[in-house]
UniProtKB/Swiss-Prot annotation:
Family the entry assigns: Belongs to the histidinol dehydrogenase family.
InterPro entries documented for this protein: Ald_DH/histidinol_DH, Histidinol_DH_CS, Histidinol_DH_monofunct, Hstdl_DH
Cofactor requirement: Zn(2+)
Binding-site residues for substrate, renumbered to this chain: 232, 254, 257, 323, 356, 410, 415
Lineage start: Bacteria, Bacillati, Bacillota, Bacilli, Lactobacillales
Protein's UniProt name: Histidinol dehydrogenase
Gene source species: Lactiplantibacillus plantarum (strain ATCC BAA-793 / NCIMB 8826 / WCFS1) (Lactobacillus plantarum)
GO molecular function ontology, one term from the record: NAD binding
Cofactor binding note: Binds 1 zinc ion per subunit.
Positions contributing to Zn(2+) binding: 254, 257, 356, 415
EC number: 1.1.1.23
Enzyme class: oxidoreductase
Protein's gene: hisD
Length: 428
């Protein structure tokens, strides 16, 4: 794993360059065509794309409840227990995110407030094949259910041998209302616009490949989306108290996700940097997903050596990683130095996969530097806020002069006259 010793300004330029994402114009065009076809031809277009891309011919998109129940009932008990533990912890954490509206009646004759309402229907995209992650389904569906979403539906690519049983079991555990065997950009189009069989949703949640991500970008505005997810990232801050073998293992835990994944270590110890690099090399040789992880390490990964701890945090805040591990002496004392990170793991026993599965905080996180302005998925992503006001005549009379003055300053005479009509002033 490459080790970089440069000044802080040069390192910042390096990480910003590595964060930049290029638009693939061919993908943009192909996805635009898929969406237009689904809008025009509905189920027929979706079936054609499933035959073309997933090599599966479907007569019915919706999966029967019998198939879902069988997957749950026949699931390995150890896997089922792990999913149920994850559900308990995810639920207990996200229950604490629930917010309430408010009513303000402090001013005489004035009632103001805000009410929170759950979305009516959301769609969860769950990748298929080797990227079928039941944990991600729990992280998507459970906050929606806690928020009170009326209907949670799931789409996932059909498989020749059937959908991953653990994913189906997780859907049942999380209370998903319906599952449709549809994948790719055509699934996103179906969720956004609806077809004869698949209902349109209010928001689309979940990661996918570049076609799914591009489709989510293109349908945004017709529906809400959670985020446009990029490759997985891990940033680790470590001093000489950290174990280089553990640091290497944590870096590889994300590198094995994707050839474009980004594993980064920033340290003030040159000796630790070399030890971690050596351990990454040796651990890669025995990793089942060696080829994928090796590409990620070589193309996107690096170890940066800086002069002091403050520079470590300064540089990492520029990275704004999806996952941030702080493996320093007394890590909690540095929480106030963390400005940009999707999720933070403090100390050597808070290894990143703990958050992936059972700790409880959501693992659907901002990537590609978007932790500068974005947050993890949560209950708040499945509710909308609506404000309301009520005034008595006397209360309106008190504020009418200010309203009409501002309306006329903005050249909106009709606004002013609407207020004046409440006091029998008309311009007929």
């Amino acid at each position: 794993m490459k080790i970089i010793n440069e000044d802080l300004a040069s390192l910042k330029r390096l990480v910003q360059t590595k964060t930049q994402q290029l638009t693939d114009l061919k993908v943009e065009s192909a996805v635009r065509e898929i969406i237009a076809n689904v809008i025009k031809n509905g189920d027929a277009a979706v079936k054609d794309y499933e035959t073309q891309f997933d090599k599966v011919t479907l007569t019915d998109f919706k999966l029967s409840q019998t198939v879902i129940d069988d997957a749950y009932n026949n699931l390995d008990p150890q896997v089922k227990d792990a999913l149920l533990l994850a559900k308990r912890n995810i639920t207990s954490f996200h229950e604490k995110e629930k917010a309430t509206g408010f009513i303000d009646a402090e001013q005489p004759g004035v009632l103001r407030g805000q009410k929170l309402m759950p979305l009516n229907r959301v769609g969860l995209y769950v990748p298929g094949g080797t990227a079928a992650y039941p944990s991600t389904l729990l992280m998507s569906a459970l906050p929606a259910k806690i928020a009170g979403v009326n209907e949670v539906i799931m789409v996932t690519p059909p498989q020749v041998d059937g959908i991953n049983p653990a994913v189906l079991a997780a859907a049942k555990i999380a209370g998903v209302d319906a599952i449709y065997q549809v994948g790719g950009a055509q699934a996103i189009a179906a969720l956004a616009y609806g077809t004869e069989s698949i209902p349109a949703v209010d928001k689309i949640i979940g990661p996918g490949n570049i076609f799914v991500a591009t489709a989510k970008k293109q349908v945004f505005g017709q529906v809400a989306i959670d985020m446009v997810a990029g490759p997985s990232e891990i940033g680790i801050l470590a001093d000489d108290s950290a174990d280089p073998r553990q640091l290497a293992a944590d870096l590889l835990s994300q590198a094995e996700h994707d050839r474009r994944a980004r594993p980064i270590l920033i340290t003030d110890s040159a000796d630790l940097a070399q030890a971690v690099s050596d351990n990454v090399t040796s651990q890669l040789k025995v990793l089942p997903r060696e080829a994928i992880a090796t590409d990620a390490v070589n193309e996107k990964g690096f170890i940066a050596v800086v002069a002091k701890i403050e520079e470590m945090f300064d540089l990492m805040n520029t990275v704004a990683p999806e996952h941030l591990e702080v493996q320093l002496k007394n890590p909690t004392q540095y929480l106030n130095l963390i400005k940009n990170a999707g999720s933070v793991f403090l100390g050597r026993y808070a290894s990143e996969p703990l958050g992936d599965y059972v700790a409880g905080p959501n693992h659907i996180l901002p990537t590609s530097g978007t932790a500068r302005f974005s947050s993890p998925l949560g209950v708040y992503d499945f509710v909308k806020r609506t404000s309301f006001i009520q005034y008595t005549k006397d209360a309106l009379a008190k504020e009418a002069p200010a309203i009409t003055t501002l309306a006329r300053v903005e050249g909106l005479e009709g606004h002013a006259r609407a207020i004046e009509s409440r006091f029998d002033t008309y311009y007929d």
